[in-house]
Design a protein with these regions (language model features):
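General beta-strand structural signal in soluble alpha/beta enzymes
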Residues: 31-33, 84-85, 178
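A generic structural signal for alpha->beta connector loops
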Residues: 27-29, 79, 102-105, 135, ...
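Hydrophobic, well-ordered secondary-structure elements that form the walls
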Residues: 48, 85, 106, 141, ...
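N-terminal beta1-alpha1 cap of cysteine-dependent amidohydrolase-like domains
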Residues: 1-67, 74, 113-119, 145-150, ...
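Generic recognition of flexible, low-complexity loop/linker segments
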Residues: 36-38, 71-72, 92, 165-167
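Short gly/pro-enriched beta-turn/loop segments at secondary-structure junctions
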Residues: 3-6, 42-44, 76-78, 84-85, ...
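Amide-donor transfer/coupling interface in amidating biosynthetic enzymes
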Residues: 1-5, 10, 113-190
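Cysteine-nucleophile active-site neighborhood
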Residues: 55-128
């Protein structure tokens, strides 16, 4: 029998709330933390999962938790395994820009996300992509965008019709991040 995966999951009512029970059930031994109020203990975990949500609505609380953001950045730079989807990916970026200003996030990914009302654009639909000879499937739903040009993706993402879309997928050390909410995460990302 193999080792049980130990996963730390960011979770709260809105910033990191897009969690599916089947995903949680597949993640082995799970513990939760709230990035708005807690500094995570990342020692001894096998993976950090940052699900989607609305971090752009809670930037003040996330900014106040500088120790949390730094701990996650340090974990990523040491090669810690992270899966970040949509809002989780936004949290890993340099900053989130809202109508109220620019707010620093974890700084793992060198991009800025705009959540300004004038920049909103709906991105919605099923997505699939290949990475390391594995097919990933999921869905995308967000109004936020990258500030400036869309960053280069490590792979091409397609919609349900098989047409290419501009949704980037990022890899940094053991970090996998995208706007795509993935299905069967652990079956695919091993």
């Amino acid at each position: 029998m193999g080792k049980t995966l130990r996963t730390l999951i960011a979770r709260n009512d809105e910033s990191f709330s897009f969690l599916y029970q089947e995903t949680i059930d597949a993640m082995g031994e799970v513990t939760f933390f709230d990035p708005e109020t807690e500094v995570p203990c990342l020692d001894g975990i096998d993976m950090l999962y940052l699900p989607g949500g609305y971090p752009e609505k809670h930037v003040d609380a996330l900014v106040k938790m500088e120790a949390t953001r730094q701990a996650i950045k340090d974990y990523a730079e040491r090669g810690g395994r992270i899966i970040a989807e949509c809002g989780g990916m936004m949290y890993l970026c340099e900053a989130i820009v809202t109508d109220e200003g620019e707010f620093p996030m974890c700084g793992v990914l060198p991009y800025k996300i705009t959540a300004r009302k004038a920049d909103r654009k709906l991105s919605l639909g099923y997505r699939r992509f290949m990475l390391d000879d594995k097919e990933y499937r999921g869905h995308e739903f967000h109004y936020t965008q990258f500030l400036g040009e869309t960053p280069k993706s490590v792979t091409q993402v397609y919609n349900a019709k098989g047409e290419p879309v501009d949704t980037p997928v990022f890899r940094f050390n053991n970090v996998l991040a995208s706007y795509t909410h993935l299905y069967r995460i652990l079956e695919d990302y091993k």
